[in-house]
Amino acid sequence: MLFIQCRLIMRKILILFAVALIGFASCADSKQSITITVTNPLALERVGEMVEVPMSDVVAKLKLADTAQIVVLDVDGQQMPYQVTYDEKVVFPATVEANGTTVYTIQPGTPAPFDVVACGKYYPERLDDVAWENNLGGFRAYGPALQARGERGFGYDLFTKYNTTEPILESLYAEELNPEKRAKIAELKKTDPKAASELQNAISYHIDHGYGMDCYAVGPTLGAGVAALMAGDTIIYPYCYRTQEILDNGPLRFTVKLEFNPLVVRGDSNVVETRVISLDAGSYLNKTVVSYTNLKEAMPVTTGLVLREPDGAVVADAANGYITYVDPTTDRSGANGKIFVGAAFPAQVKEAKVVLLSEKEKKDRGGADGHVLAISEYEPGSEYTYYWGSAWDKAAIKTPDAWNKYMAEYAQKLRTPLAVAY
């Protein structure tokens, strides 16, 4: 009898053990994860640099349902901000020491709310501007309504930013375009021009009210880094965009697709340019991918920074893949500080140089002195990728040397990207 009781007890223990194993396996499945190993091959620390993992790989490895959510964890198990982009990539900021490796984890879970850092908007009420920003600065491209008025704004414009890391452009536009205040200004101009001017300055985004401003001049130039085809030594200037589509709008990446009216290139009047521009949180530079449809032959393509002083501080370094310029801003007294502009290139640049304009050309280019250009070769059917952007000496980057160091290191990082394995 005792033997039978012992057998029954052992059987119950085995059943309980089997149930426990099944429960453990089920728990393990619920915590299934992907280990993301990020390796930095450079002797430079990489801080907050976006890495990308295809969402399709995440779904396949985690066997996720369509409605499932994920979290990205650092080595301490703390959640990282991330974004799933329009082209189905999980992007998140990685920090990796020089010649080092950092491990992150992706697993099913409910993500914490993240602050929106990179974002933008289409402003039909401001002549079709598309304006976007991150924690470091803002940018804009001009649209068809501006072109229809006959204004010539070919290049990218800039908004400086300091004293905040939060989005400011929407509030700047709202104040600049406030209809009640605009009506009041129009009324005051008839009776009290001084008061009208004071109110105009109070709402203008061309005046610094403590968080930044637009004090950059563009006009009929390449502005802060537009790319253009070249016929010999002649730049074929693009005009304002024709259509826009915002593809990503934060929290970590803003992406917009711009398509342009046909260009006349060597007698062909049907060459259409498309740009896809992306700005990531924590970066001074926008990634831009340019393509030209209906182009029949290889041509030089250049990225340019407009020069507003012929003897301004310029770096044109083709070998190391970057160009920079110190812009005096629209106020040459120095009250607005200096804007540092630059472009960096992941592929080899054929030539980088300063090209000054003749007196006649200056008049046609709104008084600009010239451009610093980085020239490459564009093959029909390909994509031309480069990065452009700016910093302000009233914010974190104070000197031309600091900006040139940032740009040189950025170009190095483009040519030696982080390695992502999983």
What are these model-derived regions, one by one?
Residues T110-D233:
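Solvent-exposed N-terminal domain segments of exported/luminal and surface proteins
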